[in-house]
Amino acid sequence: MSRTIMLIPTGTSVGLTSVSLGVIRSMEQKGVSLSVFKPIAQPRAGNDAPDQTTTIIRANSSITAAEPLNMNYVETLLSSNQQDVLMEEIVARYHENTKDAEVVLVEGLVPTRKHQFANALNYEIAKTLNAEIVFVIALGNDSPDQLKERIELARSSFGGSKNKNITGVIINKLNAPVDEQGRTRPDLSEIFDDSTKASVANIDPSQLFANSPIPVLGCVPWSFELIATRAIDMAKHLNARIINEGDIKTRRVKSVTFCARSIPHMLEHFRPGSLLVTSADRPDVLVSACLAAMNGVEIGAILLTGGYAIDDRINNLCERAFQTGLPVFMVDTNTWQTSLSLQSFNLEVPADDHERVEKLQNYVASHISSEWIDSLTAASERPRRLSPPAFRYELTELARKAGKRIVLPEGDEPRTIKAASICAERGIATCVLLGNPEEIQRVATSQGVELGKGVEIIDPVAVREQYVPRLVELRKSKGMTEVVAREQLEDNVVLGTLMLEKGEVDGLVSGAVHTTANTIRPPLQLIKTAPGSSLVSSVFFMLLPDQVLVYGDCAINPDPTAEQLSEIAIQSADSAAAFGIEPRVAMISYSTGNSGAGSDVEKVREATRLAQEKRPDLIIDGPLQYDAAIMADVAKSKAPNSPVAGRATVFIFPDLNTGNTTYKAVQRSADLISIGPMLQGMRKPVNDLSRGALVDDIVYTVALTAIQSAQADSAAS
């Protein structure tokens, strides 16, 4: 029987969609099987606009989200005294769309001036579905005592203390900038200032927990970072013409500056994330902003007003700056009219802004009570599925507990610097950046990245000499001399590897710039393989919509022998288990069972036999075709007696050609996130990045490396 949780807003502007998305992410992180049910679409600009929460969920996850009823239809039923008919239809839709879910999350209606019946309707829906009620409230400009009164008032509207289905409250927008009416007013621009300046209360969350008449299930502080919109969204809102597209789809606008002053008085506003608004007949501002962009300042965008044509000579002068990704767009309205249009910009997260949705979900989820989420499925006997959010959450939590130092040899690379900052912020690991400290700080500043505690910077020039004797000692059998050692230590990967070998750091991550060979060769020469391992292999974690699969080896061994393939299978199974994935190993071939012959099939068959002999505790079967390994209906006909077919979680490919091709085909055609390659079999953890790695890829690879180090410590003790 599913548990039904209904989130009910106590008023307007409480951030209901954000809280709903955060609660969903909290449940995903705990592996809860859930459905989302919005009984009635929240009216937006124009009654035909789709429901915001439902649209975002469908665009950003595989969770079932039923189509809500249109408000016009609901109003027709209510006005004709057919509330019973409405409730029956809601119940029918509820049961149609929430089968097999452990938890059903229901989102209520926000009461507005036009829909003042929303509270009564929410209460009726909650009773009809026998839902546990969780209020969502924003702090506004209330004191803790005033907030307590508002929570008490909300509870009394839903049956008071006698209603045992009232579970608790989630307090949102803690310490947000608000005006005298308690409305949230993020300060994007000085032109928006007026006599009613926004204020921030700075209330300690512990006061709210102690003061609330019902349990506080979450307390979400205001975060300005979550409202940083894309430049493309600003351009669409203004119906602007694109002059230079650049990174318009990814650049974030964190502030708006109207450039009406002289250049010396404007320079402080030429900073990362600024939307610079200026008349198109001010080429001095445009050229100055372009100079800043060429110096590495990631300006959010430039908005030109007035519709004046840009002189071709100015365009040519700015060409190199445009190539840095600087977005430039233009409107025909003057600066004053444009400022009015900007004030009406809706800061809601667009459904297609996947990066912002992900950031918002993770942020809100981090402030939701994990004890409450655990309690939702405490009595369930269903095994937890490891969804992609659950896997990433598990990685982050395990890495935090490990508390490791990870060296990043490509310390001045922009993505690496951003990733190090994120790792420090989340407590994933202490990142050690190798590189010129001034250059690293310059790159960080130009990107608006702060490198505080949790990020160490080591200048290779200052420390290389102390590693020369150790390198000579380790490679003396190969004829290593001090002169050659100094030359090799010019490579930061070699330096980082020696730091790892000496135990000064716990792991190494490289490859954003270096090739796989350059990343792996020094560790193989200086650190060697782990005891009991005869080779190094790799796995990718493939984050499918509803589960995580392990692919090996897709990066290291070109054509392993049967003996090597069996070891890769065992290494991969152990890696899967270490990260919470139950290993059911499929040895992949073009033939299933005994249906085919040939040297390639025989190699897989022999590797399967060897792996089963070495590790009888593991569930391993092969040869299996990919479709038989992953699809239950195919498995029934091709391998009905296989313990793995149709339910494999670990896929071992016969060679690098097959593995790498399959991994990339699945990743690209299904638009999946993959984490890896994670190297297996090293004495100390070293991991390689793709040269096209995103910042998140680096973050999760650092987390993997930290966890591997903790596991190596555990195995050695």
Curated annotation (Swiss-Prot):
It holds the Pfam family AAA_26. Its main location: cytoplasm. Residues 390-717 are annotated as: Phosphate acetyltransferase. GO terms for biological process: acetyl-CoA biosynthetic process. The keyword Cytoplasm applies. Keywords: Acyltransferase, Cytoplasm, Transferase. One of its GO terms (cellular component) is cytoplasm. SUPFAM superfamilies: HprK N-terminal domain-like, Isocitrate/Isopropylmalate dehydrogenase-like, P-loop containing nucleoside triphosphate hydrolases. Its EC number is 2.3.1.8. It comes from the Bacteria. It catalyses: acetyl-CoA + phosphate = acetyl phosphate + CoA. GO terms for molecular function: phosphate acetyltransferase activity. The N-terminal region seems to be important for proper quaternary structure. The C-terminal region contains the substrate-binding site. Homohexamer. Involved in acetate metabolism. In the N-terminal section; belongs to the CobB/CobQ family. PANTHER family: PHOSPHATE ACETYLTRANSFERASE (PTHR43356:SF3). This is Phosphate acetyltransferase. It comes from Yersinia pestis.
